[in-house]
Every structure is written in C-alpha cells, then in structure tokens.
Amino acid sequence: MTRSVNTPWTLGLTGGIGSGKSAAAQHFIDLGVHVIDADHAARWVVEPGRPALEQIARHFGQGVLQADGQLDRAALRKLIFEVPEQRRWLEALLHPLIAEEIVSHLARAESPYAILVSPLLIESGQSRMTQRILVIDVPQQLQIERTLQRDQISEQQVQAILQAQASREERLRHADDVLVNDRDHAWLRSEVERLHHFYLTLRGGQS
C-alpha cells in the first residue's frame, strides 16, 4: 500500500451494505479524525456541469437525468445492476475521477491520521491509497435485514448489491483489523474508541 507525500497516514474503512460503516465512521469523526467518504466523492464527480455527468447522459440516455439536471441515481442503479457490462463501463469512467477527489480531500487532513470510508475499497483499488484496512463485518442475513429496514428497497435489489460488492470472505482476507458490528451502538462506540487509541499509537511509530 502506498501513500502520496501530500496525504496523511490513511486507514481504509470498508464493509458490505448494512454493515454499519457510516455509524463507525461517525464515531471516528466525533473523536476528531478527518474522514472522507468515497460515496460523497462519487456524488461530487457527477454534479451538474461536471464532465462525467455529460458522458453518463450520452451513454445511457437522458432517462438517467432528473428534470433539474441532477443524476437520477435510482434509474442509473437499475440499469447497471441489470447489465454488468454497463456497470463496468461506469466504473471505468468514475473510479479515476473519484480517486482524484479523495486524494484532494485527504491532503487537507489535519488530524494525526485520516480515514477513507468506501464500500468498494477492495474492488475499486482505493485500498492503494491506504496503509491499513479496517473491515466492519456482520453476518449476511443481518446485512439484508438492516438494509431492507433502512432503504425501502426489495430483497432482490439488496442481493444484487451484495453480488456487486466483494464477498465477505474477500474483504476479510484483506483486513488488518476486523470489527464485528452485531451488537448495540454503545458497544460500537467503545470499540471505535479502542481502535482510535490503537491507531494513534501505531501512527506515532510511522514516518
């Protein structure tokens, strides 16, 4: 794993849909850690007026745009999950642009270390921007239950998302640290605090 001279020591935080990545990331933010969310970067690169949005509209048609010119994410999601080749085309377009946004935001970090939160940390190659990987892990059935409750989508859509992401086993193979998030929020907070102190100690020994 490599690091740009202009970016801080960076922890990659990942996990499947419904694993609790966002909740864990918020606890790190509360502790003063600079966190960049790859999903946010993915939204920034397709804002109206950005070249990527124009290319997407040309490729998929105007049906992927809302009346106000914003990207219709639901329409696009349906298209790319139905046709894997379309998902690969979109990833080839967006992944380099998202990486540029991430590096730009990491360079502004002032905390002792930074965190890159990404559901596709392994699949997208974003792990190359990190020095250590923390996986938020939960049993798949709990992932499905949480996502159905949170997102108001069908179980078929949840299964399609799971299939598009790295498998639980693949994520765990890449993990330096694993947090099994199958308990309550108080426990998650305490585990994040424990890991935060560990990373501060670890970072203290890094150049």
Swiss-Prot record:
Protein location: Cytoplasm
Quickly give the catalysed reaction.
3'-dephospho-CoA + ATP = ADP + CoA + H(+)
Which keywords has UniProt assigned to this entry?
ATP-binding, Coenzyme A biosynthesis, Cytoplasm, Kinase, Nucleotide-binding, Transferase
Name the InterPro entries for this protein. Depp_CoAkinase, P-loop_NTPase
User: What's a Gene Ontology MF term here?
Assistant: dephospho-CoA kinase activity
EC number assigned by the record:
2.7.1.24
Family matches, as HAMAP family? Dephospho_CoA_kinase
Task: Relate the protein's function as given in its record.
Answer: Catalyzes the phosphorylation of the 3'-hydroxyl group of dephosphocoenzyme A to form coenzyme A.
Protein name, per record: Dephospho-CoA kinase
